[in-house]
Amino acid sequence: MRAIISLILISAMVFSMIAAVPEEEGLQLSEDERGGCLPHNRFCNALSGPRCCSGLRCKELSIWDSRCLG
């Protein structure tokens, strides 16, 4: 019986924490990210999008790190 009550209380606490964060707040993107281009010094992938903004190129700094640089 205690286990069931504890499970219900924990579920209610988790639900209240999830409901406390507005959905729009977690989904907001900057105009550049929404438009598909990345600003200076952001991670990029030279083979597939999103692409760097105009004047920038995706430069491979190491095997695991590529960034939009001028």
Swiss-Prot record:
Pfam families assigned: Toxin_7
Which positions are tagged coiled coil? none
Q: What are this entry's molecular-function GO terms?
A: toxin activity
Assign the protein's first listed, main location to one coarse class.
secreted
Q: In which tissues is it expressed?
A: Expressed by the venom gland.
Q: Which residues form the propeptide?
A: 21-34
Localization, UniProt: Secreted
Name the family.
Belongs to the neurotoxin 01 (U2-agtx) family.
This chain belongs to the protein called U2-agatoxin-Ao1b
Q: Which organism is it from?
A: Agelena orientalis (Funnel-web spider)
